[in-house]
Amino acid sequence: MEARYHAHVADRLVDGATAALDQNGARFIRVSVPGVLELPAAIAMAARGPRPFDAYVALGCVLGGGAVADTLYREACRALTQLGTQGVVLGNGVLLAADESAAMALAGESDAGGDAARAALNLATLRERLALL
């Protein structure tokens, strides 16, 4: 799931996530939502739907400093964490950056999207292993 509000950053995050998923032979679909606050709702809808996925990757970015940016980021991450504690397997690739340049560095050079995808895959594997105990 990708938040498209900052499209250039979202594209870079998706590139990293897609590469990581492809490297691991994972099948996936790309779903877009407007912004980071819509990510948890969309993932919850998919997870509770008739054909849930094994794992989800949340990708998006909040730019700027100050109370509004901090609140958007914190609330999106809080809701994603809550989904995780309720058993939804997901990797969180939501970024908070001062500006687009910093966000592009996190998304590209630091491969935040790939890291989120690998986290989701690792958690999906862990869930399978724990189910066998």
Spell out what each predicted region is.
Residues 1-33:
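Glycine-rich phosphate/diphosphate-binding loop of Rossmann-like nucleotide-binding domains
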Residues 4, 8, 12, 34-37, ...:
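Residues at secondary-structure transition points
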Residues 4-5, 33-35, 61-62, 94-100:
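Short, ordered loop/turn segments at secondary-structure junctions
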Residues 22-50:
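Active-site rim loops that border cofactor/substrate pockets in soluble metabolic enzymes
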Residues 24, 53, 86-87:
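Helix C-cap/helix->beta junction micro-motif
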Residues 30, 54-59, 89-96:
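Short beta-strand segments at enzyme active-site cores
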Residues 42-80, 133:
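Glycine-rich phosphate-binding loop
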Residues 69-133:
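C-terminal binding/interaction regions
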